[in-house]
Amino acid sequence: MIVPLVPKLAIVASSGAADPTRASIPFHIAANGAAASGVETLIILAGDATELLRDGVAAGVQGVGIPPLAALLEKCAEAKIPIHV
């Protein structure tokens, strides 16, 4: 029996609000790239990245050339992308 493989991606993020572009890129890849392409995706936060989920932090994070982190988190929630801390 051939079982079709479902592409899966785990993204590990460790950058926090001090580096807004690096902090936002994992969420951008997950929401606008992988999940939008049908790839089962999850995000794992470690180190400084864990601060991004604190109340009010995401609202102040705006990377260069990508959407604001708050919008990316909203899109991740809509796509039901799990975020593990």
Segments from the language model and where they lie:
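A glycine-rich helix N-cap at a beta->alpha junction
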Residues: 59-85
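N-terminal beta-loop-helix "entrance" segment that forms/cooperates
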Residues: 49-63
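Short, glycine-rich nucleotide/cofactor-binding loops
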Residues: 9-24, 56-58
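Acidic, glycine/proline-rich low-complexity segments that act as flexible tails and inter-domain linkers
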Residues: 2-3, 35
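Glycine-centered short loops/turns at secondary-structure junctions
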Residues: 37-38, 80
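Acidic, glycine-rich active-site loops and adjacent beta-strand->loop/helix elements
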Residues: 15-17, 47-51
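Histidine-anchored nucleotide/phosphate-binding helix
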Residues: 23-36, 43
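Short internal beta-strands
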Residues: 41-46, 83-85
